[in-house]
Amino acid sequence: MIMKTYFSGVSTLGVHSLATEDYGFFPLSVDQKTMERMKNVLDIPATQLNISNSSLIGSLCVGNSNGLLVPNITTEKELELIKMFLKENSLDVNLERLKAKNTAFGNLILTNNKGCIISEELSRFRKTIEDVLDVESGVGNYAELPTVGSNGVATDKGCLVHPLTDELELEWIQDILRVDYVERGTANRGVTSVGACILANTKGAVVGGDTSGPEILKIEEALDLID
């Protein structure tokens, strides 16, 4: 199932939220009706919060079913809210506040429950990232861009990436994430940073409200969401 929506008129959903196979975090600005619809489409428990007093949850955080990485600028109150949410939903998730100069973890790491791709900008933290997310990793960039997280969206079935990703890079991504499909595509009528526009897991996807019909078909194909 795929749902189209906006967050207060904004279609870059992946910048402002995070969704994994088992949980999700959404900005405080999302109304309850939209929140419930997204939880239903993705079939996950979710809560609303800020990270570092900001709505840029998806840019600053990265996670999978095993772990969650948040930047060092995350406040103690925000950390406690996350811990409480995880406990209330009986989620055994490694939570790590990583002390890195570049705090945009969601932009620089692409992960599912099988593997992760780490931008060269965070290469020195590779071991910690692998331990928290409990996956093996590959370090590198694709489409000549360091923002491997914001330029891709991955589930345990498939992955959609920036349209300028070359064939060798597609094979590399597929090998690391251990998925059946890796496709090139866009969202929100031509936006190449697909990770900034899409929330997805194996059960469904939520895409920016500007996403076209042909783009949705490609997303369904890449993430194996076609019934």
UniProtKB/Swiss-Prot annotation:
Pfam families: eIF-6
Keyword Transmembrane helix: no
MF terms in GO: ribosome binding; translation initiation factor activity
GO biological process: cytosolic ribosome assembly
InterPro entries: eIF6 (IPR002769)
Task of the protein: Binds to the 50S ribosomal subunit and prevents its association with the 30S ribosomal subunit to form the 70S initiation complex.
Protein name: Translation initiation factor 6
Species of origin: Methanococcus maripaludis (strain DSM 14266 / JCM 13030 / NBRC 101832 / S2 / LL)
